[in-house]
Regions:
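Catalytic cores of enzyme domains
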Residues: 13-43, 47-179
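TRNA-binding/sensing appendages of the translation machinery
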Residues: 1-17
Length: 179
């Protein structure tokens, strides 16, 4: 299945840009270090365990193209944390499907998501084990130094989508012919 068809099926907004158009700022790692989400040091794909931000930026810049997408989810109100978690889970499920579709089509890719990886019900880090699925684990855009607000502006994908909604962004970095 073509990646854009999968995004259309899930009513996700998307566009494609060149990786050189992405705005990187190592300072975005500071948001992770403040531990507002509670995953700093609690998930292998979150700082500090995910690696140095400079190395993640270098890895991202090694790709040519970026399929940028967003999912918009309705929530009860701006305090609906459970609704936000359900929405994040749905967004991460879409990222996993995109990765599988890309790999099935032999596309060398690296997906970046929103927030903690979420690939496992409980991250192996909590029990002191290594990551169970390092090939499927997802690093967040912010942990990789991506300026998501600038990304939204540059791509024309809205960052705010109305009252009682939450919007999540993802990027599938890839090499080769554009999708």
């Amino acid at each position: 299945m073509r990646l854009t068809k999968l995004l259309q099926k899930h009513s996700a907004g998307y566009t494609q840009i060149e990786v050189k158009e992405l705005s990187f700022d190592p300072g975005f790692r500071a948001a992770c270090e403040q531990n507002a989400c509670g995953f700093y040091g609690a998930c292998w794909m979150c700082p500090p365990d995910v690696g140095e931000v400079a190395a993640l930026i270098a890895r991202a810049k090694s790709f040519e193209h970026a399929l940028v997408f967003q999912t918009v989810h309705e929530i009860a109100d701006s305090f609906d944390i459970e609704g936000m978690h359900r929405a994040a889970k749905a967004h991460n499920h879409l990222i996993a499907r995109l990765r599988r579709a890309a790999e099935k089509n032999e596309i060398d890719c690296w997906p970046l998501g929103a927030g903690a990886c979420g690939g496992c019900k409980t991250c192996a880090k909590k029990s002191g084990e290594p990551c169970r699925h390092p090939g499927r684990a997802v690093v967040s855009l912010e942990a990789a130094g991506v300026d998501v607000v600038e990304l939204a502006k540059r791509t024309g994908l809205p960052y705010i989508n109305g009252k009682n909604t939450v919007t999540y962004f993802g990027v599938l970095l890839f090499r080769g012919a554009p999708e």
